[in-house]
C-alpha cells in the first residue's frame, strides 16, 4: 500500500501530463527538424547507390550497353549517355553541384532504362514477390524528389554554407 501511495504522490495531474507530453514531442520535433540534413541523406542515398551501377559499367566498359542499343537499332554512341546518367549525374548529386539538373538527368536515365529493359516487366513480380521494376522506380522517384527539393544547405554548389 505504501508503494501505491508514494506513486500517487509522484504522479502528475492531467494538466501537467499534457504539458510534459507536449514538451517531449516539441523537443523530439526540434531534434529531427533538420531539412537540410535530410536533403543530404537523400542525395547520398540516391546518388551513392546509382554510382555503384555506373562504376560497374565504367569498369566493364560500355560495350555491353552499346550492344543492347545496336540490337534495338539505336546508335552505339548513346551508351556514353549511360555513363553521364549513372556516373557524372550521381557524382554531381552527391556533391550538391547542379543538383536539380543532375537529378533530372538521372530521372531521364531511368526512363530510358525502363524503355530498354523494363517495359515488358512493368506489370510483373520477380521471384521474391517484389515489383520487377522497383529498383528503377526507386531511383526515378528518388531523383525526382532530389530535383524538387534541391541540394539543401550542405552542398558544394551553394555560394556559401548559409
List the predicted regions and their residue ranges.
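Membrane-interface interhelical connector segments
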Residues: 59-73
Amino acid at each position: 500500500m505504501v508503494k501505491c501511495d508514494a506513486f500517487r504522490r509522484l504522479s502528475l495531474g492531467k494538466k501537467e501530463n499534457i504539458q510534459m507530453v507536449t514538451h517531449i514531442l516539441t523537443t523530439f520535433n526540434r531534434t529531427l527538424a533538420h531539412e537540410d540534413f535530410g536533403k543530404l541523406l537523400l542525395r547520398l542515398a540516391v546518388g551513392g547507390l546509382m554510382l555503384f551501377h555506373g562504376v560497374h559499367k565504367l569498369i566493364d566498359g560500355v560495350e555491353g550497353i552499346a550492344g543492347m542499343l545496336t540490337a534495338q537499332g539505336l546508335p552505339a554512341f548513346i551508351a556514353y549517355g549511360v555513363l553521364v546518367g549513372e556516373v557524372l549525374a550521381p557524382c554531381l548529386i552527391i556533391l550538391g553541384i547542379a543538383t536539380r539538373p543532375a537529378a533530372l538527368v538521372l530521372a531521364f536515365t531511368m526512363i530510358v532504362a525502363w524503355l530498354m529493359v523494363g517495359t515488358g516487366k512493368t506489370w510483373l513480380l520477380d521471384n521474391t514477390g517484389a515489383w520487377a521494376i522497383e529498383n528503377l522506380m526507386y531511383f526515378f522517384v528518388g531523383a525526382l524528389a532530389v530535383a524538387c527539393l534541391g541540394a539543401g544547405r550542405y552542398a558544394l554548389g551553394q555560394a556559401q554554407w548559409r
